């Protein structure tokens, strides 16, 4: 493997290892929030995602590209924002209502929310919970800070309501 003919292979192995560490760091930092929500292919899909993100690091030489540098590109951040931990329960399919999300203010809200109409629910479900969280994650230092708003529980009925959740953003 030290032969110059294997230089590209060494670069690929290095970047694959870095992507695997980044994906594990994200999964571990999300902890219990995704433990029961993920699907059996989440790890594979995260690896694919981080491979795409890593390619957006145009500063570092091949073999040394970093997720942290790539995330300075808004396109890379958009990839992460659109990732669903469970492909069979994507937010856009489960929540059939537009919502307001302001990541810089730490707020999430839904106006005129009618749970029985606006949520795809399992048969027999009578109640649901909305959990809103924000994760600060430093891929270079492996430091993470997960903050969570108080969960909101509600009946799956036809009574319109306003959902408004806010949290203090993490430092990391």
Features from the language model and the residues they span:
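Long, polar/Ser/Thr-enriched low-complexity segments
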Residues: 1-87
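Charged linear interaction tracts used for macromolecular binding and regulation
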Residues: 55-172
């Amino acid at each position: 493997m030290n032969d110059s003919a294997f230089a590209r292979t060494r670069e690929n192995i290095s970047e694959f290892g870095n992507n695997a560490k980044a994906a594990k760091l994200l999964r571990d930092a999300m902890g219990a929030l995704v433990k029961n929500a993920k699907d059996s292919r989440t790890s594979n899909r995260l690896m694919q995602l981080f491979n795409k993100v890593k390619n957006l690091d145009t500063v570092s030489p091949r073999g040394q590209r970093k997720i942290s540098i790539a995330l300075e590109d808004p396109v890379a951040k958009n990839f992460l924002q659109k990732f669903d931990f469970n492909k069979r329960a994507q937010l856009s399919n489960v929540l059939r209502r537009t919502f307001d999300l302001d990541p810089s203010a730490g707020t999430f809200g839904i106006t005129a929310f009618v749970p029985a109409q606006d949520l795809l629910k399992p048969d027999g479900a009578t109640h649901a919970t909305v959990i809103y969280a924000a994760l600060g994650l430093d891929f270079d230092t492996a430091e993470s800070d997960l903050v969570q708003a108080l969960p909101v529980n509600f009946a799956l009925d036809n009574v319109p309501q306003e959902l408004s959740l806010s949290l203090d953003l993490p430092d990391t």
